[in-house]
Regions:
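Active-site nucleophile-adjacent alpha helix/oxyanion-hole segment immediately C-terminal to the catalytic cysteine
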Residues: 1-51, 98-102
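Sequence-level detector for tyrosine residue identity
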Residues: 6, 14, 51-53, 58, ...
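Noncatalytic regulatory segments and standalone regulatory/sensor domains
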Residues: 100-103, 111-126, 130-176
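Predominantly the structural core of cysteine protease catalytic domains
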Residues: 37, 41-116, 121-123
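Short, flexible active-site loop motifs that bind/organize anionic cofactors or intermediates
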Residues: 2, 86, 147
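Short hydrophobic/aromatic-rich motifs at helix boundaries and adjacent loops
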Residues: 7-10, 84, 129
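Short coil/turn linker and secondary-structure boundary residues
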Residues: 21, 87-91, 149-152
Length: 176
């Protein structure tokens, strides 16, 4: 029986498969965006950028003595060790639109309750953004063993991510 993939692992799997990269060895239970970025890099996608804005986790990481037994800090430290830079970057409509336009894929961390319009949901969720037309963004949403593809308004996506640190991984086109 196949292990069910967490949404972050599903995002990594989707992007690796689209780049014709084997996905047999990816972790099924990745939850930290830094963990997703490390997996993408370890599997050959090195042209990555990581952005966040107003993230409590990142602020604590850069301003305090950190406890590396906490996975959130451990993976951020590993990004540092791998020379993957995290940039604090505000998320406005224009900057977000530009990020989407200038990348092949973006993995975005959204607040589940906002993204699904369901206040009973808690925690974060990862989705893939893949291009836009005007204010409409193509969203690939990993759900269990499949991917739901839909179009959402850019303002809605900003609303869904801004209170969760606006964490995003920008995956640029790889040179072949």
């Amino acid at each position: 029986m196949k292990k069910q993939l967490y949404c972050g692992s599903s995002c990594v799997k989707y992007i690796l498969e689209k780049n014709l990269i084997d996905t047999d060895n990816i972790k099924s239970d990745m939850i930290w965006i830094s963990e997703l970025a490390l997996s993408l890099k370890q599997n050959g996608l090195s042209n990555l950028h990581i952005y966040c804005y107003n993230s409590k986790l990142y602020t604590e990481f850069i301003n305090a003595k950190i406890n590396l037994s906490f996975d959130g800090f451990k993976y951020l430290k590993e990004l540092e060790n791998q020379n993957i830079q995290i940039v604090e970057k505000n998320i406005s409509i224009n900057s977000f639109a530009s990020e989407i336009d200038n990348c092949k894929y973006m993995i975005l961390c959204v607040e589940s309750s906002v993204f699904n319009n369901d206040t009973s949901m808690v925690g974060g969720h990862y989705v893939i953004l893949n291009g836009r037309k005007g204010n409409k963004v193509k969203v690939i949403n990993p759900i269990k063993e499949k991917y739901e593809i839909k179009t959402l308004n850019i303002n809605f996506l900003i609303k869904a991510c801004k209170d969760y640190g606006a964490w995003r991984i920008i995956i640029m086109e790889e040179k072949r």
